[in-house]
Amino acid sequence: MVPVVALVGRPNVGKSTLFNRLTRTRDALVADFPGLTRDRKYGRAEVEGREFICIDTGGIDGTEDGVETRMAEQSLLAIEEADVVLFMVDARAGLMPADEAIAKHLRSREKPTFLVANKTDGLDPDQAVVDFYSLGLGEIYPIAASHGRGVLSLLEHVLLPWMDDVAPQEEVDEDAEYWAQFEVEQNGEEAPEDDFDPQSLPIKLAIVGRPNVGKSTLTNRILGEERVVVYDMPGTTRDSIYIPMERDEREYVLIDTAGVRKRGKITDAVEKFSVIKTLQAIEDANVVLLVIDAREGISDQDLSLLGFILNSGRSLVIVVNKWDGLSQEVKEQVKETLDFRLGFIDFARVHFISALHGSGVGNLFESVREAYDSSTRRVSTAMLTRIMTMAVEDHQPPLVRGRRVKLKYAHAGGYNPPIVVIHGNQVKDLPDSYKRYLMNYFRKSLEVMGTPIRIQFKEGENPYANKRNTLTPTQMRKRKRLMKHIKKSK
């Protein structure tokens, strides 16, 4: 499971600046959920190939009423949901009562916490952090987030060792095995008996959506009708439950972000929305079922979730729930709204269901299998190059500075989502419109459905770049004669 790192501290200690450094963004709006996470922002970050989710919390005022009552509710939730906390203090302002109150609260939670002293630029770091040792949180890590100083050291000496301890990399790298086997097939070598086959693995299926759209009802409907072997496998400390199941002789692992509950116990008060559980489920899944309430339509929260799914490259099936009981006129209006607001993801299947009564639920798995098969299918270099050539013949690349962009060949670069790597000259100058044309052409030719497809471009190396031609003695004499002739003609 992807680790979660929360940044907490008083207002204006530099949390958002560090957040932007870690997520490599400027506006910190990587996966923002308006109305639910007013003062929490979420982003995907990476250090040496290890991914983690970073939370930027709102400032904590630490008034005399105490942290427990005055701390922003969203910041409290962020601390509870995080695996590790980076507690930030302002080295310029020095130790404040609010810092002591926050430290007391963090100690009571017994959460792994690292103390980070920001704004140490222009100061003696050792002298600036002395007072903060009284907080009793161990070693202090001085940084200057605005200039990036000390941030890399913080990642390498704090976060990386911590992630290696609590979330070691899996011994089996599915992607590496997949492409190793692909290379064996490309070279015509005989495959070993224990080949990696994506079809032999269970499909990890996450059901996500806003509160009260029917996620738990759909989960229980699926398990109630098709339960074969079900037992709870806690995946993390956060209540996400992995439920093995089988349907039509195909194994699945259902990632339930709301927890498995008896139908009678599902109430509005109980089914609370957890952003972190949802983001982790999306990251860990092969296919995501995005559940939308037909009666409420598509909200900004739905679009934010959708954006995170697309950025993660996960396969997608859209489920419009509570379809029963709507008049034909309302149904037509809902479909028009879907076409208008979701027209940019025409690759995803849309299902209209009633999780409560079970209508349409059985058809979901056909789309889930289709999306998974599309995202894990191996395609040869010859096939991809042939499709690229056909696309170029149908619509030539544009001219750049009087020369036509040349695409040479294409090959596979990854799966889940499928990645096509195209090599050529001047590809960096290709306009976005032509890149979209190529993406749609590959999607149509490969009949990819249910999964985004990504195209990466690589520039061909110029063997003469940064090289100067050395003239031979004969060429030098010829050049001198030519220069004399030019001077005389003047």
Curated annotation (Swiss-Prot):
SUPFAM superfamilies: P-loop containing nucleoside triphosphate hydrolases
Domain KH-like per the UniProt entry, residue ranges: 377-461
Keywords: GTP-binding, Nucleotide-binding, Repeat, Ribosome biogenesis
Positions contributing to GTP 1 binding: 9-16, 56-60, 118-121
Annotated residues for binding of GTP 2: 209-216, 256-260, 321-324
Stored InterPro entries: G_ENGA, GTP-bd, GTPase_Der, KH_dom-like, KH_dom-like_a/b, P-loop_NTPase, Small_GTP-bd
Database matches in CDD domains: EngA1, EngA2
GO biological process, one term: ribosome biogenesis
Top-level taxon: Bacteria
EngA-type G domain sequence ranges: 3-166, 203-376
Annotated GO MF terms: GTP binding; ribosome binding
NCBIfam families for the chain: GTPase_EngA (TIGR03594), small_GTP (TIGR00231)
HAMAP family noted in UniProt: GTPase_Der (MF_00195)
Function of the protein: GTPase that plays an essential role in the late steps of ribosome biogenesis.
Homology family: Belongs to the TRAFAC class TrmE-Era-EngA-EngB-Septin-like GTPase superfamily. EngA (Der) GTPase family.
Subunit details: Associates with the 50S ribosomal subunit.
PANTHER family: GTPASE DER
Protein name stated in the entry: GTPase Der
Organism: Salmonella enteritidis PT4 (strain P125109)
Gene this chain is encoded by: der
